[in-house]
């Protein structure tokens, strides 16, 4: 099924109707309720003891509420071309005179994805009168190794009281991740390559009075400071020559849904398709036409509720917590062949405790139209908003086999 390219104009599941008793007792969680929940002055909110940026939840709420006006002129078209939004809270930062040094762990950024936009969002308290600063961006997995990505100059003023400062770092990340080069342009200043301790020593020797170095061990930054500095990356997965396994299953169980296993599924499907064509040719030559069209049983869409808490995903999925994926139902005796194409929907269905009758689908009564759903969740230590295709059955119908 073709991938829906318009990320912003997604169709989301409507409020669950006829909610089963097992789910009625649970309190529904909405993006708005999380936004109104307890938070600290650092702009982060808690979920199961883990913190996520306010911006990510606000972005998710704007999308599902279709509030296009709340998106910036840069983010609006970018969302339509993206299927993944990753956020990286700064691991630490230091300010030495007019030099700011920001550290992020960008290990999970994949070069196989097409980078659409990278934004640096700084939401810090007022610094009084405006002054120019040089901002340097580093990638670091730990405090021992630091990789310089690029730098730029900007003016920091009291405007930070009312809003966040947003910088477009797309070219910085693109040049280094794709080309392996640091960006050197007029609006970006090349760093001198000095170690942080050298900068501190230089500032001390000059008797700078405005040096503010936050340390933990050597480079500590309080939660307040770091969590108000985030890097947001918009990307889209590149199309593959071969069909991919379900995106959810591939992320959770890469060995189970490896390329070799996927190739076997594709080959099996091709054999099945070839056998069906041969069977059709035989039937055409040997079976006389029927005078009256055969009456088929009714193929209908029925509820199939998915509760992520019950299948063990509740600790890392922020929203939605539950939804109606639906399934197709009709009287039949033969289940679907295992060589049918795997989808996110079929993967979710395999995890539900359905009876044999509920799990079985007629080969002719199948989903003929699926819709996508966006999910907000943790992926390792990163907070991700990702669009998954083929998650909900929209229409059921008969298919000839």
Curated annotation (Swiss-Prot):
**Which residues constitute the signal peptide according to the record?**
1-18
Q: Which residues, renumbered to this chain, are glycosylated?
A: 168, 337, 344
Q: Which GO terms describe its biological process?
A: gastrulation
- Please tell me where this protein is predominantly located: secreted
Q: Name one GO cellular component term.
A: extracellular region
> Which UniProt keywords are given for this protein, alphabetically ordered?
Cleavage on pair of basic residues, Developmental protein, Disulfide bond, Gastrulation, Glycoprotein, Growth factor, Secreted, Signal
Checking PROSITE patterns in the record gives:
TGF_BETA_2 (PS51362)
Cystine pairings recorded for this chain: 299-365, 328-396
Q: List where the protein spans the membrane.
A: none
Which stretches of the sequence are propeptide? Answer: 19-274
Q: How does it assemble?
A: Monomer. The propeptide region interacts with bmp4 in a non-covalent manner.
Family in the record: Belongs to the TGF-beta family.
Domain remarks in the Swiss-Prot or TrEMBL record: The propeptide region and the N- and C-terminal thirds of the mature protein are necessary for neural induction activity. Although cleavage doesn't appear essential for activity, residues surrounding the cleavage site are necessary for activity. The propeptide region is both necessary and sufficient for bmp-inhibitory activity.
**What is the protein name stated in its UniProt record?**
Nodal homolog 3-A
Organism source for this protein? Xenopus tropicalis
Underlying gene: nodal3-A
